[in-house]
Amino acid sequence: MNKILINTPERNKQLIDSYGRTIDYLRISVTDRCNFRCTYCMPENMKFLPKDDLLTFEEMDNLCSLFIARGIKKIRLSGGEPLARKGLIDFISNLSRFISYGDLKEITLTTNGSLLNKMSKQLYDSGIRRINVSLDTLIKDKFYQITRRDDLENVINGIMTAKNNGLKIKINTVVIKNKNFNEINEIIEWAHKNDFDISLIETMPMGLTDQDRIDQYVSLIDVEKEI
């Protein structure tokens, strides 16, 4: 693919927010589909967008090119589960040309980890160097309760495979009342032992999945007291 708009007059017009801060980070959801059904995220019978309503990868590439021309330096790909969308690796490989041009610093990705066993080497080869993995528990039964999928062993193996394939890993853990709140210290210890960064995240106390999310909410103030 050719460079798009990188050498046009628009190149120097950086994006500025209402507080005068330069915007250099873009997050793109490549799909709303996911192979998990986390209780704080979506119901079991989730109705997804028609595929024709999603941007094609060519359209996403053009969109990214426009943002890069306005000063975006970092792009994060997310979903849904981004690795579930066919053609993602080719999209990343094409987008990585901007890294080689010096116009983009990095492309990162957020995943639930379920497809890392098969795809982590492809991710590395396509230009990805860092990934975030959503992991809320290290206990098999709890994992099923949270994700509605019996896939913990595969996810853990996938994370380790990704590490062995050269990817830097950050664990994202959503803290959930009566689910993993009393396990947080163990998760942090496991992450640090394996040289993973970790972020603890509040579940948003709004909206409905199968239940009001306020029932699952734990403030980070309470988490700090726990650890």
Q: Which ranges hold each PLM region?
A:
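A short acidic, helix-capping loop that chelates divalent metal ions and anchors anionic groups
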Residues: 46-50, 139-146, 207-211
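Active-site phosphate/pyrophosphate- and oxyanion-stabilizing loops and adjacent acidic/basic residues
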Residues: 28, 93, 185, 221, ...
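Conserved alpha-helical substructure of the radical SAM core
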Residues: 2-107
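Short, conserved loop/turn and helix-capping segments at secondary-structure boundaries
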Residues: 54-57, 149, 214-217, 221
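Radical SAM/AdoMet-radical enzyme domain recognition
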Residues: 57-77, 84-201
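C-terminal accessory region of radical SAM enzymes
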Residues: 165-166, 218-227
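Flexible glycine/acidic-rich beta-alpha junction loops that bind and position SAM and/or redox cofactors
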Residues: 178-179, 199-220
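Generic beta-structure capping elements
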Residues: 31, 43-44, 134-136, 201-203
